[in-house]
Amino acid sequence: DEGACCVTQRALIGRILEHTMSQMRLNPLNGRWVTIVAERAQRPNDFAPRDSSVEDPSRPCPFCPGHEENTPPALETVEKDGTWSMRVIPNRYPAFDGEEAFAVHNLGPVFVMAEASGIHEVFVYTPDHHSGLHLLDDDHAGQLMRMLRDRFAEHAATPQVRYTQAIVNHGREAGASVAHPHGQILGLPFVPGEILDEE
């Protein structure tokens, strides 16, 4: 009966969404996966209102030395001269999280979704709040590449991760919510269509 089918489908959707902080939906127009994470809209923002380019001075930077208690415990730390020079921490507002296997749910003609399981980490690649990737010396840049290599190897050993990507988004225009120089490492449960197109 069609009514019972709709009730069952709504119950399935409810169960999936109830346990999923983030989800992926298949764009029916281009066949590419899109990640939807409502919680990321609630991230604190270091920047003043959109019409200003200055930082909000009332909020201490969680990525600066001495504020480590404002972030989750480090997954990896590179030390230099008795203090850290780089840290990798879990993203407090992950787009990808969880150990579920990639499973597609066809919930309607244009509603195809999957849990956004995977790994989402932040790498703070300098303790200097006013530095940037382009200002790292050769030794520091080499350490950063080795640290990223190690994180990629760990992701590759994780069953639900099929593709890992590192990104650096510096400044509000690039989508960063914290002004301190940092990047993100995303362990995805699928290989993005753009990558498959290049093969």
Segments and roles (model prediction):
Residues 5-6:
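Cysteine-centered motifs
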Residues 16-199:
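HIT superfamily nucleotide-processing domains
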